[in-house]
């Protein structure tokens, strides 16, 4: 019986999660004329597609090469990789790592390497996306329909800004039902960088929740 409080807490968490209604984000005004690109690909799929962008060979990795600082040493580090291609045939090898902290923790590292050009490398460092196209800032997005003015901020997406101009948005409010917006007036290389980063953030959220449920299952088993 000493484990009863822990079991009850886990049950309450599971009931709460199961009762959460799907969230519908509010599209920023200057994104409303940009075509929405729904993400096609289920939770455990090895492939994701949206618009003319395709992520495939998605798989977990055991490596730890991007997050080596001591402040993350006590956390379980999740790493994954995938290939990104476009309708034009450009291909990038993509690799990411993040610590299993809170879902809205900003610590995130990715590299996007052009298969055909070793000098074409994109780097995602927390909320900064750097490449030969320049630096893009990523900000958390918290606006959704029905949000109460006094409620705590809930992360529902990410905005991409180039010199304070909004150029992209990724909706991660509903796992396995994500959507991406990328300004089509951007040069192709910058679009690819935003697409690769968006794919990485989508996979991060999916894998965080996957790890979260695995921990719940393990803790439930340990109480018996």
Describe every region a protein language model picked out:
Residues 20-224:
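Intrinsically disordered, low-complexity proline/glycine-rich segments
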Residues 12-13, 103:
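Residue-level signal for mature regions of secreted extracellular proteins and peptides
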Residues 15-18:
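C-terminal motif of bacterial Sec signal peptides marking the signal peptidase cleavage site
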Residues 3-10:
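Sec-dependent signal peptide recognition
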